């Protein structure tokens, strides 16, 4: 998956897809009560990027739903996966559960439109800290009594992006009601302004490939330097989050990679662990 980073304006959806992305990451900002309010990252962010682009949440989710609904004039078949980078550090932790419920309602009614046929992209809920796990728990429990529980079970995955201990991550996912390999993505990375080793990525890949692991997919963020991308691919990641999707698309055509990797399509299940 080529994961377009920090796609927070409606026009950026097509911009990143046109550059070769088949996935986007969207930053979700919340009000002080934990209700989703805007798409917004804020400063600091990545080098050579504007950090303050924003849309009202309802407007962006409406556009995102259109872009991922077959038959809609704005449908883009390339967009198969959306990572919601949930900025849950801006409100009191006591509101985490209610915030997760509110975001579940947003997805159900504004993205899926209360229908099996709208908003088909797979979704990853990405939390910045392990102690925010009640957001995931609440999101999942919202659908326990819903006729749309099948969409939760088919289309929603989970990630913690704070580079915390992976053994503890497994424990916390269990607390949130998420079983081993139940749609678990594991990210590792840092701003593109700083070089980061692949040690933790390789550790995550080893867990992914272990018979007793809990991870389905591993991705690295945020890179676009050719050497860094090649190194990440050689480490066997499943996704790369980037500001320059065309760089990754070009590298995938190189002799060293063209027979080892291909761009994921909607037929490729992001919850299945790939076996070579």
Swiss-Prot record:
It catalyses: an N-(acyl)-sphingosylphosphocholine = an N-(acyl)-sphingosyl-1,3-cyclic phosphate + choline; an N-(acyl)-sphingosylphosphoethanolamine = an N-(acyl)-sphingosyl-1,3-cyclic phosphate + ethanolamine; a 1-acyl-sn-glycero-3-phosphocholine = a 1-acyl-sn-glycero-2,3-cyclic phosphate + choline; a 1-acyl-sn-glycero-3-phosphoethanolamine = a 1-acyl-sn-glycero-2,3-cyclic phosphate + ethanolamine. GO terms for cellular component: extracellular region. Its EC number is 4.6.1.-. InterPro entries: PLC-like_Pdiesterase_TIM-brl. The keyword Magnesium applies. The active site is at residues 5, 41. It comes from the Eukaryota. Mg(2+) binds at residues 25, 27, 85. It is found in: Secreted. GO terms for biological process: killing of cells of another organism; lipid catabolic process. Its main location: secreted. The keyword Electron transport does not apply. Expressed by the venom gland. Disulfide bonds join 45-51, 47-193. Keywords: Cytolysis, Dermonecrotic toxin, Disulfide bond, Hemolysis, Lipid degradation, Lipid metabolism, Lyase, Magnesium, Metal-binding, Secreted, Toxin. Its cofactor is Mg(2+). SUPFAM superfamilies: PLC-like phosphodiesterases (SSF51695). Binds 1 Mg(2+) ion per subunit. One of its GO terms (molecular function) is metal ion binding. Belongs to the arthropod phospholipase D family. Class II subfamily. Dermonecrotic toxins cleave the phosphodiester linkage between the phosphate and headgroup of certain phospholipids (sphingolipid and lysolipid substrates), forming an alcohol (often choline) and a cyclic phosphate. This toxin acts on sphingomyelin (SM). It may also act on ceramide phosphoethanolamine (CPE), lysophosphatidylcholine (LPC) and lysophosphatidylethanolamine (LPE), but not on lysophosphatidylserine (LPS), and lysophosphatidylglycerol (LPG). It acts by transphosphatidylation, releasing exclusively cyclic phosphate products as second products. This is Dermonecrotic toxin LlSicTox-alphaIV2iii. It comes from Loxosceles laeta.
């Amino acid at each position: 998956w080529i994961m377009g980073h920090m796609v927070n304006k409606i026009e950026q959806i097509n911009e990143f897809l046109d550059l070769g992305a088949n996935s986007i990451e969207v930053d979700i900002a919340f009000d002080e009560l934990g209700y989703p309010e805007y798409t917004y990252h804020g400063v600091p962010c990545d080098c050579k990027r504007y950090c303050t682009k924003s849309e009202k949440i309802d407007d962006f989710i409406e556009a995102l739903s259109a872009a991922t609904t077959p038959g809609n004039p704005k449908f883009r078949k390339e967009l198969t996966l959306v990572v919601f980078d949930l900025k849950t550090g801006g409100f009191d932790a006591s509101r985490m559960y209610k915030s997760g419920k509110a975001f579940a309602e947003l997805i159900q009614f504004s993205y899926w439109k209360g229908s099996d046929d709208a908003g088909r992209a797979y979704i990853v809920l990405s939390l910045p800290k392990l102690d925010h796990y009640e957001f995931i728990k609440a999101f999942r429990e919202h659908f326990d009594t819903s006729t749309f529980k099948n969409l939760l079970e088919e289309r929603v995955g989970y990630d913690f992006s704070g580079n915390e201990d992976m053994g503890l991550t497994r424990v916390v996912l269990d607390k949130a009601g998420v079983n081993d390999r139940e749609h678990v993505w594991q990210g590792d990375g840092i701003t593109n302004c700083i070089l980061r080793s692949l040690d933790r990525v390789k550790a995550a890949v080893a867990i992914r490939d272990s018979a007793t692991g809990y991870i389905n997919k591993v991705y690295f963020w945020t890179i676009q330097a050719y050497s860094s991308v090649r190194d990440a691919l050689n480490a066997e990641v499943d996704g790369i989050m980037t500001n320059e999707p065309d760089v990754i698309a070009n590298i995938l055509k190189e002799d060293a990679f063209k027979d080892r990797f291909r761009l994921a399509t909607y037929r490729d299940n992001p919850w299945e662990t790939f076996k070579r």
